[in-house]
């Protein structure tokens, strides 16, 4: 059955009176057709329907099982990884899939992370509740990495010639457009110049001090697109742009590229992921922070996965993730301090991501988009319970967001200028839409006339100068995302949408018959989204009959070890490192090289800043890894080898919270600390409140993550010297 659409005209209503002047809104629905009203420059409400796996044009496929991992006691990290590597060695079928790894019922203990780094691999549980991956240890990374290789190669850069490209446009004029062809992969980059920053009031946030203000190049947006049509210099793309390109504020560019290392068509489904933690500390943070991290990947999915105890995110889509679907997922009982960069439960920094039918408890930012997420990104039919912070964009300029039938329990939905918060986030979004949402308060402000944020058919307390319509009223269609998708594909999508049934016919004066019927309904427990998700049946096969067991497949030895006995002997040899007369020697030979002093204060997370960052061992940015973020230790060791650095001069952070970089000697109002975090060698107590708003340190408790990083670095450096 097609999603119901009935005639509406969005207008501005208020309790007790109707405004006496006419106001035109940007969307009308009549005779089952959506009509978008463009402004005088051609800007209109975005088409969000290209979000998700394969731009939501296909259902998520059922991939055949090719290897089975039976339950076994002990550490299962290597067994599961070996099964994934086995599937990676298989030839893809015509659809690009190699096959699925089927995990048995039971609790699989893991000491390390699981990595999917080859296209066409699915990790599948036999039972969503009974197939459990339990991550142990003090590592704060992800339990599962769905991650390709960042080997993006820009081949050509073409100037955008169009003077103005409106919001939602897919066609633009470029220099030498004839050099392009249908199917080419391109990126469109919009610059962020000084004049544009000043026009938004984001150069200075107060105090006459510009340190936290946006700087030129900080907010460049880059959209990843495919060429659909070329007509002379006119190029048509497969998905709309979420912000207008205005030549008055700088020249945009179209880049052609090749990205061989990016993976695609991978999935994680039908299981429960749990982060183990120290039960003596209810706010323990020396455990796994992220359930699933998706990076350098497109057209992938996560579905029917439960998450428990993660301090950071259940799922985070990194800025190099695109066309990702996360659906029918539940996150409960997060374990962490209550503070900044924690409990960002369903979080995207990428584009064309779709989170649908997701449920989160006790998150701080349950449904969130991060720094310069280019969009569009959509959250459809998502609920939170006991939220501890707002949902929306939680950093700077994440544009083209849709919150469609989203309920935030006990906190806000926010589109606004965050000012200096989040290390100078400023305007958090533009051209975004709240559609039939509920929250404690909905904040909907607009940064500019051609960067309008809107809220239609929402229930809450309200604030903001964005575009509002039918507040505290139900509107149709029930889901704008699926109405747009049906219109674009010209077919019904009700089965895929699985919209939770709700009676939206409200009246304060029902007839006697209606009142009696409503009284009968009141005896039935209300169907919640959590139960609606739980009732969804998993379609793909979970039968292990006839599927190879990983324990019956011979393990392949690496070529280096198989062909070189001297290498094996070398790995078993422990070099003798001594200090003689103040000189460092290894096996009697003088070690020579430079030194590197770790950064131990200051830092930002903007892309421009990261390019200039220096390697660190105990710098921590939740959910994000790389230079200037949470450094991967092997990358630090490689840096030392390349630069002929012998000594890494380690020091703990001068202070933990980047708010302290202002040198103000004040107690902070809350625990919304700013990253990157330079860790201290001692752990938190979980008790009391320190001046930065987190719990006080326990000087008798070592910071297990801090010391494990130093140990791992020492071991890795030792291996590199052999």
What are these regions (language model features)?
Residues 120, 129, 192-224, 228-229, 264-354, 367, ...:
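Right-handed parallel beta-helix
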Residues 600-617, 660-708:
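Aromatic- and acidic-residue-enriched carbohydrate-binding clefts of CAZyme catalytic domains
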Residues 7, 12, 21-281, 455-559:
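Extracellular "leader-to-stem" segments immediately downstream of a signal peptide or signal-anchor
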Residues 92-93, 112-113, 132-136, 236, ...:
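Short glycine/acidic-rich loop motifs that flank beta-strands on beta-rich extracellular proteins
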């Amino acid at each position: 059955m097609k999603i119901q659409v009935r005639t509406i005209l969005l207008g501005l209503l208020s309790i007790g009176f109707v405004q006496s002047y006419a106001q035109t809104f940007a969307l009308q629905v009549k005779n089952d057709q959506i009509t978008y009203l463009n402004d005088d420059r051609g800007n209109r409400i975005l088409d969000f329907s290209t979000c998700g796996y394969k731009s939501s044009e296909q259902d998520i496929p059922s991939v055949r099982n090719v290897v089975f991992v039976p339950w076994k006691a002990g550490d299962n990290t290597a067994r599961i990884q070996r099964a994934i590597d086995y599937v990676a060695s298989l030839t893809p079928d015509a659809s690009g899939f190699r096959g699925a790894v089927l995990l048995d019922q039971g609790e699989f203990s893991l000491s390390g992370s699981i990595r999917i780094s080859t296209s066409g691999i699915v990790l599948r549980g036999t039972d969503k509740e009974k197939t459990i991956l339990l991550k142990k240890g003090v590592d704060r990374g992800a339990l599962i990495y769905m991650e390709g290789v960042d080997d993006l190669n820009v081949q050509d850069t073409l100037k955008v010639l169009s003077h103005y490209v409106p919001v939602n446009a897919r066609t633009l004029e470029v220099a030498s457009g004839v050099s392009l062809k249908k199917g080419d992969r391109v990126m469109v980059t919009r610059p962020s110049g000084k004049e544009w920053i000043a026009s938004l009031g984001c150069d200075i946030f107060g105090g006459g001090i510009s340190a936290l203000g946006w700087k030129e190049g900080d907010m460049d947006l880059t959209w990843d697109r495919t060429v659909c049509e070329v007509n002379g210099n006119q190029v048509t793309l497969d998905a709309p742009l979420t912000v207008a390109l205005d030549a008055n504020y700088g020249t945009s560019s179209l880049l052609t590229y090749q990205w061989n290392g990016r993976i695609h068509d991978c999935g994680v489904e039908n299981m429960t992921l749990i982060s183990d933690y120290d039960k003596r500390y209810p706010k323990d943070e020396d455990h796994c922070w992220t359930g699933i991290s998706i990076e350098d990947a497109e057209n992938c999915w996560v579905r029917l996965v439960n998450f428990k105890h993660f301090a950071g995110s259940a799922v985070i889509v990194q800025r190099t993730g695109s066309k990702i679907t996360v659906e029918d997922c539940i996150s409960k009982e997060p374990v962490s301090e209550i503070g900044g960069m924690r409990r960002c439960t369903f979080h995207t920094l990428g584009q064309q991501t779709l989170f649908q039918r997701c449920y989160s408890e006790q998150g701080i930012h349950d449904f969130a988009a991060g720094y310069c997420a280019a969009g569009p990104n959509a959250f459809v039919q998502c609920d939170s319970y006991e939220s501890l912070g707002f949902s929306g964009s939680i950093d700077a300029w994440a544009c083209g967001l849709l919150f469609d039938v989203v309920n935030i329990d006990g906190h806000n939905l926010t589109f606004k200028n965050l000012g200096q918060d989040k290390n100078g986030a400023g305007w958090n979004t533009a051209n975004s839409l709240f559609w039939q949402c509920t929250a404690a308060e909905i904040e909907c402000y607009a940064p500019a006339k051609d960067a309008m944020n809107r809220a239609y058919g929402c229930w809450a307390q309200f604030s903001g100068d964005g575009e509002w319509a039918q507040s505290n009223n139900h509107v149709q269609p029930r889901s704008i995302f699926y109405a747009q998708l049906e219109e674009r594909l010209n077919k019904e999508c009700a089965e895929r949408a699985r919209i939770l049934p709700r009676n939206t016919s409200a009246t304060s004066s029902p007839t006697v018959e209606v009142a009696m019927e409503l009284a009968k309904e009141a005896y039935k427990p209300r169907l919640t989204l959590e139960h609606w998700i739980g009732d969804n049946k998993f379609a793909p096969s979970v039968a292990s009959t006839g599927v190879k067991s990983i324990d019956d497949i011979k393990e392949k030895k690496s070529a280096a070890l198989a062909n070189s006995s001297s290498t094996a002997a070398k790995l078993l040899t422990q070099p003798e490192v001594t200090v003689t007369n103040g000189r460092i020697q290894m096996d009697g030979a003088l070690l020579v090289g430079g030194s590197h002093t770790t950064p131990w204060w200051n830092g930002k997370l903007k892309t421009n800043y990261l390019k200039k960052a220096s390697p660190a061992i105990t710098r921590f940015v939740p959910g994000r890894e790389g230079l200037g973020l949470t450094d991967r230790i092997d990358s630090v060791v490689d840096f030392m080898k390349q630069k002929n650095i012998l000594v890494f001069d380690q020091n703990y952070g001068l202070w933990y919270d980047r708010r302290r970089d202002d040198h103000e000697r004040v107690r902070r109002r809350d625990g919304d600390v700013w990253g990157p975090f330079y860790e201290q060698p001692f752990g938190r107590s979980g008790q009391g409140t320190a001046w930065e708003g987190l719990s006080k340190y326990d000087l008798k408790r070592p910071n297990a993550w801090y010391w494990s990083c130093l140990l791992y670095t020492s071991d890795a450096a030792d291996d590199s010297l052999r």
